[in-house]
Amino acid sequence: MEIEDRTETNLVAIRRTIYLAIQSSLSFEECAHKILKMEFAEKDYGEICAMIIDCCSQQRTYEKFFGLLGGRFCLLKKEFMEHFENLFREQYDAIHRLETNKLRNVAKFFAHLLHSDSLAWSVLSNIIITEDTTTSSSRIFIKIMFQEMAEYMGIAKLNERLKDPTLSPFFEGLFPRDNPKNSRFSINFFTSIGLGGVTDDLREHLKVSTIQLSQKIQAEKLAALNVDSSTSSSSDESSDSSSSSSDSDAKKKKKKKSKTSRQ
């Protein structure tokens, strides 16, 4: 019976092996070939993906080698792609812990996987762009990643992808429509990074919703005025009725008094 060794020592050995394969390779094809030849167990695929990102983040500047390597593994087996999808979420959630240089490299790495369609664009559902759900670090990450994608794809193709109806449910956090404040924040963010064009639909939505909100407020005010007017009218009628009744009673009393005097 084979005993699974998942001790820290074994994990360190695996990482070291992957690290040496990366450092000793002249091309991403050679590196992928070396790692695959080692025949790692499927349970270690996550370590391979994590090491690729870790080595990428350690570079002084982003090296396309790592994006190509990560993309190759994503295309080889869906298990690798799934691990990178999970790592995207983990990296984004902990992005505030990365120093700027590492953050930049990781953002460009994932931008490569996305614009090359090595990674499913559904991972972008992890991003919600509002004032309350972003930090300075996460905004820098999003900025670098989207600018990198725009550079490789072109703004027109990027815009086309972001408007794909089959993917739109995954982009609701990027272009929030839950309230005008969040919509404006997203529009201002993308405009500030030179990608205002991707928010055209959101701008139109904000314009329409603002008009509808204004009309709703006006209708409510008008309804309130009508209620006040109706209440005031009823009050006046009641007052007039009461006054008429009082006058009538007074006349009757006066008439009765006059009749009594004559007798």
Predicted regions and their residues:
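Hydrophobic alpha-helical bundle architecture
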Residues: 90-100, 104-134
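Long, low-complexity, highly charged intrinsically disordered regions
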Residues: 1-65, 82-85, 240-248
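Residue-level signature of the C-terminal ends
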Residues: 21, 25, 34, 38, ...
